[in-house]
A protein has these predicted regions:
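Hydrophobic faces of stable alpha-helices that mediate helix-helix packing
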Residues: 61, 99-106, 128, 132, ...
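Amphipathic alpha-helical packing segments from all-alpha helical-bundle domains
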Residues: 65, 81-86, 117-144
């Protein structure tokens, strides 16, 4: 098995563990067991549980091609409308037809809120940094245009 494939296997196992047990209730040992590897091998790929968490966070934010498209738009009222429609549409889609991976992400978020909230805070911060500048600039342009 290649290093990249093993890394993805570990991340997949970690997502399941974090979604089921929360950040505090998940250990690197339990992630290693879920990935059917030794804890030492897990540490070759990720130096800590927090590093695993951060990698999942980065994947969640960067995996959405629609978000990448929106962030590439020129700030404007139209971009602001697209951003809001995209955010609302995302959550409506989750409600109507969540796929397995999306359901797992939602469990991870809910579990985080029920636990210490660390993952949720990190995700909100990451999303805020990704979307915030475009959102704020688009809102400013809309206000300046009187829209």
């Amino acid at each position: 098995m290649t290093s990249d494939l093993r890394r993805q296997l570990i991340l997949s196992a970690a997502k399941r563990c974090f979604a089921r047990n929360g950040f505090a209730g998940t250990t690197t040992k339990s992630v290693a067991a879920a990935a059917a590897i030794s804890e030492g091998l897990l540490f070759k790929h990720f130096p800590s549980k927090a590093a695993l968490y951060a990698e999942i966070l980065a994947e969640e934010c960067e995996a959405d091609p629609d978000l990448a498209h929106l962030l590439g738009q020129e700030p404007s009222t139209a971009t602001l409308v697209e951003l809001v429609q995209g955010m609302v549409g995302h959550f409506m889609q989750l409600r109507d037809a969540p796929d397995q991976e999306e359901a797992q992400r939602m469990r991870l978020m809910v579990t985080s809120h029920l636990d210490d909230g660390e993952f949720a805070r990190l995700l909100y911060d990451k999303v805020g940094k990704l979307i915030g500048p475009t959102f704020a600039a688009s809102l400013d342009r809309a206000i300046a245009a009187g829209e």
